[in-house]
Amino acid sequence: MNLKAVLTSVLFLSALYAQSQHGEINMAMGLKEVSEHDSSKKYKNVGDFFKKGEFEGHGRYFFMATDNSKGLSDFYANAFGMGIGYSMPRFHGFSVSMSGFFIYDLGSSDLTANDPLTGQRNRYEIGLFDVQNPNNHHDLDRLEDLNINYKYKGLDLKFGKQHINTVFINPQDGRMRPTLVEGLTASFSPGKKLTLYGGLLFGASPRSTVKWFQIGKSVGIYPEGLSADGTPAEYAEQVKSRWLNYAGLEYKPKENIRLFLWNQVFDNVNNTFMFQPEWIIKKRKFEILLASQFIRQQTIGEGGNSEVSLRYAEVGSYVNIFGGRFEFRKSKRWSVQLNYTNIGNTGRFLMPREWGRDPFFTFMPRERNEGYGDMKAINLILALQHKKLPLTARFGAGRYDLPDAKNAALNKYGFPSYYHFISELRFKPKGFIEGLEFFFLMVNKIGFGEDYNNPRFVYNKVDLSNFNLIVQYSF
């Protein structure tokens, strides 16, 4: 074991001891905030000051396996990782936070091997490690948080490397570690009804990587798909963008009404706007949630590059997206959702998959609807909560009608239309082992669109089953 691993283990055990009296912390979603109490009292010494800070830790085991259709390659992976974080005590509103994480491969398929029939690489399991270096199994470590935070009344500012959870940039926590960003983020709540959000980002460390990248260079790390003319996209390391900014507004004029506005500008690439109103109808024994969603995206500047072959987005392109949700909630025991999404046919919806999952109501694990135009989707989600046990379940079924798999102008990844099914179980015990969590996910996708008897339109896309087991402990 190298020195880095030894030091990490020592720090982890120290954190466990120091935090034996603290509550549950989920490192997968970022550092726990230190107390908002502004402690300006005098400390005995520097050591006493640091002892007043908060340690936290997270350990995760992840098993994943994919069973493709007959004749195509199957894969499995076992990953284990641990991390620690520390936040200094708040002083005159300021606090400094830092965290890191390392991952080990406990035994997996050869994730560097291409499928013999299609020549394509592994899609899902490689994401547990480093997609840029699939041969690296034992030295996967990443600095995650390193930031300074300031809080005053309803204002919250954070600058540096940090976790983030916004509409289009979010943890997408379906692998070992989430997507992280570098820059300035802010939120301000002048009252109980209104919250304002803003951010200026210039760097990112996408999920399934161990490095940090300038914001433009973080695009194209994952498979690039096809350009609108059907040729292989070549925008990796070619997106010329200096920054990304976002601004949002959440307004609750009444307890049962929520209005959400969001606008994101990706310098020299595109502008994406979202409006989402929600209305809750409360009755004595049940609730009904009605929500709609409108998204408009349009290319700005050069679409990422002045050379057509290196662009991320087509100049002059735009697309409108509409969505709706009906949700029936029966107490806290169960709920059912009916969701719908319609992406217009004027162009593709493009949002780097490296940054997070799409915000559509019809999102389901292990697939995205990014990269498509002229798409219609509908799904039904049932959520259940056990009456006595800390056990929840979620089941879903959806239909996703996509453009023809050969229509690259509206189908970036050459995907046939498909049915999507999910089954989830989550168990979070209480008492002595509180902080421990078990999660199981099974996904099935069945293609019904034309695949032209071409296995490249099938492999790791449709006619597959994907299995996931996660055991994690947070403190």
Model-derived features with residue positions:
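Repeated loop/turn-to-beta-strand initiation elements of outer-membrane beta-barrel proteins
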Residues: 54-55, 92-96, 154-158, 193-196, ...
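Transmembrane beta-strands of outer-membrane beta-barrel pores
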Residues: 61-65, 100-106, 152-154, 161-166, ...
